């Protein structure tokens, strides 16, 4: 197993990142190692039990081991692997177990702390900040809806295009509705009534992703669906 050096970041990150600030429901769930959170538009997002039809964040899955669908993603990957929005590090851990050099980055102090406590190479850093590039990343991962980071899918993909090697790929897990394409101010809430500060987010389906990718200089290489999860492999446009 090969880990990349997780040099400590001195970057100051704003509290209005994914699920940050406010009542800190994401941090509470990470501390518990479990919990169902709801991601919903900030406007009119009352603090209610997690309902059907909203984006449900399964922290137990994020904090647990990679499942068979995750492992298949890594079987299609080439190293080194950069997991953007890595959370507590399940994909970094799985990549290392598969013999792929890997590094995770996340803006959540709590998530990075959990990952580092497990001995994983994870940086407290934004993808839009300084990220080690060297000769380029073999695979950049945007899983678990992380194509929504920053509320600007085209901008995020353009940044990933800068990081990926010419022979590499950006693997994106998309919204199950192929045509979905919306950016919005979101909040995360939990059943205990905790609520994050609003943050910029987006939801993108596989069809809409192709348009954002084209604007970023990327092209669709392949798509697949496993266990209700949809993935798109993007490669640098020729």
Task: For each feature predicted by the language model, list its residue ranges.
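A short acidic, Gly/Pro-enriched loop at the edge of an enzyme's catalytic core
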Residues: 130-140
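Short alpha-helix
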Residues: 199-217
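S-adenosyl-L-methionine
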Residues: 2-76
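Conserved SAM-binding strand-loop segment of SAM-dependent methyltransferases
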Residues: 119-129
